[in-house]
């Protein structure tokens, strides 16, 4: 099982969204205090919809508490300062992928101690960072892709049928089918 770690998250809606993503991906969520909200706040639950009760999560008092309770864990740390691009590393089945708080990321002293396992998402232009929920989803689904989507619930056949029916295509002839095939080829589905 993959593990997502949020170090001192500040925005409840981001954490709720990430919780929902973890449920969908079959990943465990680790939350390291202090957090900028209470875990039972409405904004956390609202962003996680009705999936929060299905989420496997643990809350830790501090970063040292997290390390003590997860000895020997392989931890990748997402930061804009990393040399390694997230898609260039091989994510192990039970690894941990850590993200820092929205306003400051992972503290420099932690990154220095773990330089070899820091990863980044490439960005263009004058952007300082991506939204935390988006960043988690990008890296988590790359790790799942590398592992062959081990807990996937569907082969996509029913989803393709539903998409075709939703567009009123019926037998999927013509341009729509070309677009679907392009999309699937582009995203390697």
Residue ranges and their predicted role:
Residues 1-189:
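Post-transcriptional modification and biogenesis factors for structured RNAs
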């Amino acid at each position: 099982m993959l593990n997502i770690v949020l170090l001192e998250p500040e925005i409840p809606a981001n954490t709720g969204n990430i919780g929902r993503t973890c449920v969908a991906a079959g990943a465990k969520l680790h939350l390291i205090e202090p957090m900028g909200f209470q875990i039972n706040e409405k904004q956390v639950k609202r962003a996680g919809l009705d999936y929060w009760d299905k989420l496997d999560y643990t809350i830790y008092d501090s970063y040292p508490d997290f390390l003590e309770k997860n000895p020997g864990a392989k931890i990748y740390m997402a930061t804009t300062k990393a040399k390694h691009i997230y898609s260039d590393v091989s994510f192990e089945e039970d690894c941990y992928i850590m993200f820092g708080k929205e306003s400051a990321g992972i503290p420099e002293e932690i990154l220095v101690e773990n330089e070899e396992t820091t990863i980044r998402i490439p960005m263009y232009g004058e952007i300082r960072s991506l939204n935390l929920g988006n960043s988690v989803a990008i890296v988590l689904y790359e790790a799942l892709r590398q592992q062959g989507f081990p807990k996937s619930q569907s082969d996509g056949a029913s989803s393709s049928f539903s998409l075709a029916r939703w567009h009123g295509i019926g037998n999927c002839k013509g341009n729509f089918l070309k677009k679907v095939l392009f999309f699937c080829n582009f995203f390697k589905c």
